Curated annotation (Swiss-Prot):
This is Probable histone acetyltransferase HAC-like 2. Acetyl-CoA binds at residues 1071-1073, 1090-1091, 1146. The lineage of its organism: Eukaryota, Viridiplantae, Streptophyta, Embryophyta, Tracheophyta. Residues 964-989 form a coiled coil. A zinc finger (ZZ-type) spans 1265-1328.
Amino acid sequence: MKQGQGAHLSGQRIGHHPTAQMNPGDGDGNGRHQVASGHASADPELMNLRIRMTNRLIWELLSREPKLQTRPRKLVSDLAKRFEAVIYKKNPNKAAYYSILNGEIFPHLQHALSTHMAQHQQGQQMLQQLTSSSSYGTTIPIPDVVQNASGNTRALYEMDNTSGPMSNGHHHFSANFPLHSTTKGASLEMSAVSMQEGKITHMIPTPGSSNQQSLPGNFHYSTGTGYLNGKSNVMAQMQEQQAPFASKINCCPVQRDLGGYAGSGVHSDILNNSSPYGVSEAHMIDGMGLHRSNVQVINRTVVPETFINPSPYGISPNKPLQRHVNPSTRSTPTPADIAASTSFNGTGSSALSTTSYLDMTTVNSLPKSRMDSGLIMSQPTIQSFQTEYYIQTEGLDLQEKISLEQLHQQVNQLHLIQPHSQYAQNQCSLKLQQQNSLHHLVMSRGNVLTQCHLGSDHAEKLLDKRNQLHSELVSSQINEHVGLTNLQGHYEQTQYHDNYKKGQMSASSQNLGIPAPHDLLPPQQQFDDGSYRLSCFLKETYTKPLQPHCKSKPMKEVIMTSLLSGKIQDGFCQKKMARDREHHPIISGWHSAGCAATSFGSEEVMENTKQYHAQARWLLFLFHAKSCTSPPGSCKSSYCDRVRELVVHLTDCQIKDCSYRHCRESKMVSDHYKNCINEHCHVCCKAKEMLRRSSELAHKQNPAEPILITQHNMNQRSADRVHGDRMDIDQAVETFDDQPPAAKRPKLQLVSPDASENVPVCQKNPGFMLQEAHPRQLDQNKKMVPDQEVDVGLDIRHPQVTLVSCHGSDEKIGAAQNTVIPGALNKIHCHVQQETVVADKESVTVVDVKKKTGSVDVTISKTGKPKVKGVSLMELFTPEQIHEHINSLRQWIGQWVQCDKCECWQHQICALFNARRNDVEEAEYTCFKCYIEEFKRGLRMPLPESVVRGAKDLPRTLLSDHIEERLFKRLREERQERANKLKTSLDEVPGADGLVVRVVSSVDKKLEVKPHFFKILQEDNYPAEFPYKSKAILLFQKIEGVEVCLFGMYVQEYGAECKFPNQRRVYLSYLDSVKYFRPDIETVSGQALRTYVYHEILIGYLEYYKQRGFTSCYIWACPPVKGEDYILYCHPEIQKTPKSDKLRQWYLSMLQKAIKENIVVELTNLYDQFFVTAKECKIKVSAARLPYFDGDYWPGAAEDIINQLQLEGDGKLLKKGRVNKIITKRALKAAGHTDLSGNASKEAMLMQKLGEIICPIKDDLIMVHLQYSCSHCCTFMVSGRRWVCNECKSFYICDRCYNAEQRLEEKERHPSNSKCLHILHPVEIVGVSEDTKDRDIILENEIFDTRQAFLSFCQGYHYQYDTLRRAKHSTMMMLYHLHNPTGPAFVATCNVCNCDIENGQGWDFKSFERKQNQLSESRRMASVNERVRQRVAEVTRHE
């Protein structure tokens, strides 16, 4: 026998260690210790990991459940230890355990809870089997039992964890488990222990001494209630003997409510005499409000205050075990009796206490499906049943019996049965038990209340306060713009008053209702038929309506109308959801939604929940008032105008403790909403969700839309028992058991328009999302609709998304439309809740409905569009990648695309939709929600990446391969350096992945020399044009599954075939980047990793061109003007534009790395190299030596200077002074002129003026020498030898200059003006290519032909990079055009019809484009000139 199963019989000691837990379901037979305090592992590192895991679990519990912060630390610690033990048992491997510790722990916490609860339930079933085979007629008292004066033994999670043997040789039994944990709630308060453990703990059975048999429990009342069915095989005898007593008294409310309606088999009486134990009647049962001395159970044992029905040994051994009470001494019951709390204990059990009369609830509101705790009969006898059972069976007519039979059929459909604390269940026939209990249930509910005399004012006050409590709870979430007309009942006020006074309230055994808010309804209307339409928080189950004759009793139509069912409703919903959720209690409870998340009987948590609801409701009201567009006084919310004034006040109020009404409170809740980072915040969670839905649907609302029935959605939610959130609770639809079953995966049906005529249209108000609709009126001559699980929702179509959903706690959800029950009311009591939401988790598809005889033939309408693979890049994604992509999106205005499945609309940018692949608008598009659904159902798989070509599919070149090879090598080295610094492995260090470098454009071009400049230098054989190759290089990185362009640069390559002065030179024309590089970390040196990557790209480029024989590179470090873009259109707002100093330093730091690698041999600037003569330079300063590049600054400036000089010579420009006044002597000497006042050449004057402009910004004009240049002739040496001076740095001369040096006299040789001579050593020049021919193919692309062309292309199509969302889409479209170069790149839009105009079909499009490019270039030059003038002025001020 397993130790966990038979310990309580063997007498062995269990759970003696303080941290040990009894695991009845474990097969090892040992109590497993939770953490290292139990059996110690041999690995100290593992012990440390387990301690860390426990601490993290404690933190998770405290952070997700604020209520636990007020509880003792030990209780939370023990709970975490138990969860840790489950996690460790599942993951004993150290590596797996470590990954869980450092990863997302919430799923594992859910699994631990589920495992723990499963073990608990298995242990309960084992104990149940043992107790069902044993008799407890005689018990052995436990001397050390502590009697609780409050009548309740309450604990958070564990109880009775005693140690040491008892004095009589018996041992304690330890069982620790939650009994009242909630799902979708905020409470982790739990009842101490179930009744059976309490019985075993305090009363030891004595075999062979029993003379009584335990009654079996009703199978339908077994799910966590602990009640025994009072209708057993002895019910007929009891009914026969109760008639004489029934004539003497009117009723016994508590007895009938507990024993008759709830089917518990427990009966109690209210006695006038005082308790024999001297207990005050006012404090009976922990303040339940039962103002009588004692409550008796079936065996007629008087219940003292300490325990309602314990063995009397612990208090007074001399007291009799049983005491029968004279029925004639009973008093007339009051409504307070009816409002008795459910905190009744079984023998030795701990009760789920209530704290005040506000928490009192009649047990008759309990459904058969769930109860939090219950009563168990101790030693019941047939005689006691026969003498003390009072039921009146008269008054139930034929029609009611028919309704009861229908009710019985529906009850049998519930799949809510889950044994929890059912301890005596094997003595009676199940069939008779079900029939009798159900019959007795309705009789006691329907007749007892009608026969009771509610003659106490206290009862009405109690009910009023109870009503007020529920009204406040409901009104905290109901929108204020719900019209009072929707809340009107169908009955007169006098009828309500009479029914309220007499207690004639009829409800089904499954129904739980919430009255209308007291601040929205008059008191006389708070209990009519319309009141149950506001059941927005608790699930409600509606049974079949009664027969038409019930109209004489209008309150029977009100299926859910008990004012006394508040607390029971909370507990019912919590327990129901605890079993319906896929996840177990506690974990699901952290998401607090759906039901009032309070501990059963906890007034404190109830008040907190009310406060949470009020704050969230007020927050939504503030948003509504802020965005409400209705004229003043016309908003359906009567308080909108006042809150608008408050919002206006809040925008300008700066006073901390402002006295303006509601100002301070509004600031607090709004500030909390802005700063809250808790994902499970009770206030912000639902407010954010509703606001998100409202913002997405604000522009889509259109009332004229058909209604859909989405069956798959309801199948999923009904089968899994997953209920909605607190503001999204659906209502019940009728179920018909006599219809044929629905298909396994039913299709969809479109409801006819007449079925939705009475459904109101949702308001265009983003602040309030819920509205209630009237029940739909159905014709009697409609055909029956087969029983199908369906969801009622408005079609999700553009421009609004509105859902009308019906949902309940029945296992089968029937169709609510076009349905009539023969002989029943022609009204379906279905409360249609209308929501304005984006979409359900399951998508909706529009289909046609074909009505046939007795069934619905549903066919899916095909789209008829061709399936073009790769129309959306998301087709390549997995659902995880789709979620990752969607989570990174932000709201933005853009073009839209409609899903062909659910017809919802999405941004093309968010959907990564390629409109170019949908030219004829015939391509089928599937949104991500439908895509995920099809993926889950196995109807779709991610397409291979080859369907949509990406950056890797672009043509590779020698240059791109060289840069990539170097980049990846350097990234591996850098990653290893970080790993060494952190003393960890390489795999544990994040690295840059998914990088691709490609040359997207490589075309031959010619640069024409400007006419004025060419005219001046024409005599020097200056070339009229320079051939060069223009290249565009891009860097891509895959971010969240999408390739994003992060970096781009344009370069000009002037090869060996080009004439002097541009021969073998490279010009870095433009460089641009966006700040989306991942990961955003730093290198070991403290440099950003993204900067490191960009530098390596530039160094790799310089290295490649040095190997090809290029000699120098020219860089103009010129940052763009604010708002100007070089290559990529629209940069992120977080990316700052660097200043000139920062940008220059950025380039210089890159070049210093290149110098260390001997790629760059020397750095200088344009001014020092060409405008100033070096010490031993033997060449004169001339404009003909300046490298002439396309788009560079000085060629344009030189043309303007020459034009100005010509105007001065012609006398057309007023001279403001002589041009030679500021020229330096050094410059005159270098130019070879001694007098510029007269006939100075235009070239010399040009160099003078140009030098004046360039000198202040000379540091920004960087000259990079890839090869050594001669110090005498300034030419780059690419062949032969270079002569090096070991004593002088940076002195190199070529062979030609060395030969000329040798012909000079010694005093004129190097170094000049020095008496000692330096010896020069020759160095052979190797590794320089004789020609610079590019062996890469020509890559032509219209959009990347020039920088301005690509920028104009992006501007025209709004391919922006200001957000990652847009950067993904822009890169996708860029790659599409790169892979399809023959397609039209520049398409204009007609100003008349807004259609695209292809090339050749528009009017003067090319000339317009040229003018735009010229205008843009002129504007750029103007801005550059202005920036240069500002820089010159700045340098002048410093000097």
